[in-house]
Design a protein with these regions (language model features):
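Cytosolic-side membrane-entry/anchor segment at the start of a transmembrane helix
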Residues: 1-43, 159-168
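Loop-to-transmembrane boundary segments
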Residues: 26, 97-124
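Hydrophobic, membrane-inserted alpha-helices
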Residues: 37-44, 61-63, 122-130
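Membrane-helix exit/interface motif
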Residues: 41-48, 66-72
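Hydrophobic alpha-helical transmembrane segments
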Residues: 49-60, 135-149
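Transmembrane helix-loop junctions in multipass membrane proteins, especially transporters and channels
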Residues: 50, 131-139, 160-167
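Inner-leaflet juxtamembrane helices
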Residues: 54, 59-105, 156-168
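Hydrophobic core of alpha-helical transmembrane segments in multi-pass integral membrane proteins
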Residues: 117-132, 142-160
Length: 168
């Protein structure tokens, strides 16, 4: 039962819980960038050590899986922020509305989109290009590389579509 004074306590408890989830997701999302870079370095090391360009096909798979995870976390981070902005439970909590109104937000989001595309899509496409320019490869690997290129294109499209929806 809610009594006088209790709604503010409930709103504060909800806010703390939601913000804790958002912070956890931000940490996960940020760490995914580092994990991706390490995974790319590992795949390139294996490719170089094995003297086989076929291992380059690991890069798009890794960046695709981690990119989707990154995008899903980013979506939830944005959804939490939107919820807190649109359902203000406590007076005086202006950060959630003031921060997104920053006039440089659009340029920051554009730069972030470019970084995301290079990290999660460009690196995979670079590996695929190196694979395609190598000596002739078995048809099954070529077919796999085409599927990876399509999947990477879909991921890039999702990053762009999502950025357009949230940058406004």
């Amino acid at each position: 039962m809610v009594t006088a004074g209790k709604p503010d306590e409930l709103a504060l408890a909800e806010y703390r819980q939601i913000k804790a989830e958002q912070v956890a997701r931000i940490n996960t999302r940020d760490n995914l960038v580092y994990v991706t870079l390490v995974a790319i370095a590992g795949a390139l090391t294996i490719t170089h050590s094995a003297h086989s360009r076929g291992y380059l096909l690991l890069v798009p798979v890794v960046t695709w899986v981690l990119g989707w995870t990154y995008l899903a976390n980013d979506h939830m981070i944005t959804a939490i922020g939107r919820y807190v902005r649109e359902h203000p439970g406590l007076p005086g909590m202006r950060w959630e509305t003031d921060h997104p109104a920053d006039r440089r937000r659009r340029s920051r989001k554009t730069i972030q989109l470019a970084v995301d595309l290079v990290t999660f899509c460009g690196s995979g496409l670079a590996a695929l290009t190196a694979f395609w320019l190598a000596d002739p490869q078995p048809p099954l690997l070529v077919l796999a590389s085409v599927a990876e290129a399509i999947a990477t294109g879909v991921l890039a499209w999702q990053f762009i579509a999502y950025a357009r929806g949230r940058a406004s």
